Amino acid sequence: MEKRENPYLRYLRRERLPHIFCAGCGNGIVLNSFFKGMEMAGIDFDNIAMVSGIGCSSRIPGYVNCDSLHTTHGRPISFATGLKLGNPSLDVVVFTGDGDAAAIGGNHLIHGARRNIDMTVICINNSIYGMTGGQISPTFPEGSYGSTAPYGALEDPFDLAELVTAAGASYVARWTTAHPLQLANSIKKGLKNRGFSFIEAISQCPTYFGRKNRMRSPVEMMRFMKENSLNRRKALKMEPDEVEGKIIVGEFANRPQPELCEKICSMVDEKSGRALDMIRSAYRDD
């Protein structure tokens, strides 16, 4: 029987395989959903520029055969902003994680959303610092265990989708790795949106989060995410105590609005035109 090849292998740098991700990591699922969403959106792969910071998920662009920037910790959105302003015709995609985006990069995240600059940010949220030993991140669930929370986390976690929605992003969605088709569809919408798009992918880290919280199997973790998810449309009609502890998934914002690059270009055209009119007027007066 002929072995079928994954159709998305053509987008990868095969010479860099095998990857460094742990067995059962959700990064591969998210990348697969990205390729599917990209094809559904009709985006030209050669026009994509990927940007990432530091963390497990930030290693993803290194395996993708496109132009990419591997930047400093917490700064991928800043670099992506400069890239987009320098060449507005590019389709800029940021791969980041919960630590990279919500901790050291938190200010850059909310201001990127506020500016509504055209880029698609895919945040793989596994609630943990997986490259440095399993320290807890700003999205770590209260009461769960990590290497820096041996008796259980005491802090309330960030709700990234709600945070970015409040900051002004024009498209925001959240799914889990147990919802790959829905995730791909939201990535498609994010890529087609003219503005700041934020897609949060709740993912499993069996190596650190799973072992510390008695969910050693990736399948067990994904089953938990699937069974514990609740669509936002339904959640909005329920009482707060009914949705407590649930993973709220779905679209949080889909509101087209003026994009920063377009506003800058319009301003330049307007001001340049006025300057030329003033020069012509001066010559006519002479």
Swiss-Prot record:
UniProt keyword terms in alphabetical order: Oxidoreductase
InterPro entries given in the database record? 2-oxoacid:Fd_oxidoreductase (IPR051457), THDP-binding (IPR029061), TPP_enzyme_TPP-bd (IPR011766)
* CDD domains in the record: TPP_OGFOR
Tell me the enzyme class: oxidoreductase
**One Pfam family, short name please?**
TPP_enzyme_C
Catalytic reaction list: 2 oxidized [2Fe-2S]-[ferredoxin] + 2-oxoglutarate + CoA = succinyl-CoA + 2 reduced [2Fe-2S]-[ferredoxin] + CO2 + H(+)
Q: Name one GO biological process term.
A: sulfur compound biosynthetic process
Give the range the annotation lists for the signal sequence: none
Q: What is its EC number?
A: 1.2.7.3
Q: Which domain of life is it from?
A: Archaea
| GO molecular function annotation | 2-oxoglutarate synthase activity; thiamine pyrophosphate binding
Subunit field text: Heterotetramer of the KorA, KorB, KorC and KorD subunits.
- What is this protein called in UniProt? 2-oxoglutarate synthase subunit KorB
> Whose protein is this, by species?
Methanothermobacter thermautotrophicus (strain ATCC 29096 / DSM 1053 / JCM 10044 / NBRC 100330 / Delta H)
The gene coding this protein = korB
